[in-house]
Amino acid sequence: MNPALTMAKKEYSLSLRSLGTYIIFGVFLLATGTMVALTALRLGVADMRDTFSRMHLFFLFFIPALTMGSIARERSLGTLELVTTLPLKLGHIVWGKFLAAWGQLATVLAFSLVFPVLIAIFGVGVDPGAIFTGYLGLLCAGAAYTAIGIFASSLTENQVLAFIIALAISAVIFLLGRLGELIPLKVFALIEYFGTDYHLDSFLKGVIDTRDLIWFAAVTFIFVLLAQFRLQSENLNQER
C-alpha cells in the first residue's frame, strides 16, 4: 500500500476514536439539518442549492476544527520529531494527514445524505443529478479547505491559532466571490475567479466543468506542498 495511504488509514482510525471528532460531526449535521428543516422541508422546496451554499459556509468553521490538530497537536506533544524520523518521506506524512482529514469530511457528508432522502420521502422531490454534482462540488471545495487547514496546522503548535489561521485564509477565498457590491465590476470579474464560490457555483447548478476541478485541485496541491515545505524547513533548521 502507498505510504501516504497507510498514514491516512492510521490517522483516520485514530480520529474516529476521539470524542471531539463526533462532537464536530454532530454540530455540523445539526446546523445542516436545521437549514434543511427551515428551507426545503418547511417551504416544500426541492432545490438544495441553498442548503449546499449553507454547508459551504459551515465549512469555514467545520474544516479548520477538523484539521487544527493534525500537525499542531503532534508538535505540542513533542511527537512530531518522532513522526518525521519514521522511514517515510515528509510528503507521505503530509498527504496522509490531508487524506485522513478529507476522509473525515467525506464521512460527515455521507451522513448528511439523509437530508435529500428525507426531502424525497416527504414528497418534495429531488433531482439526483443535482444532488450528485452538489456533493461532488462540496468534496472538491472541502479538499481545498482541508489543505489550507493542514498548512495552518503546520505553522504552529497552538491548535487554536491553527484554527484561526485556517479560518482566516479560508474566509478570504470564500469572500472573494462576494465582493461584487463593494468593488468595480471589472476588478470583481478578475478577483472572483480566485474565490471558491465562483467555482462551486457550476456544481450547484448541476454542471461539472473541468476548469473548476482543476482550480480546486491546484489550490489543494499548493497548500499541501506549502505544509510540506514548512516541515522541511523546520527540519533543516533543527539539523543546523
Descriptions of predicted regions:
Residues 47-50, 66-84, 98:
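Transmembrane helix boundary and interhelical loop/hinge segments in multi-pass membrane proteins
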Residues 35-37, 43, 58, 100-160:
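Secretory targeting signals
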Residues 1-21:
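Aromatic- and glycine-rich beta-strand/loop motifs that create alpha-glucan
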Residues 53-73, 108:
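Long, hydrophobic alpha-helical segments
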Residues 162-236:
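Terminal transmembrane helical anchor/hairpin motif
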Residues 63-67, 115, 147-148, 226-227:
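Hydrophobic/aromatic residues in alpha-helical transmembrane segments
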Residues 17-38, 54-63, 168-172, 222:
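Hydrophobic alpha-helical transmembrane segments of multi-pass membrane transport/permease proteins
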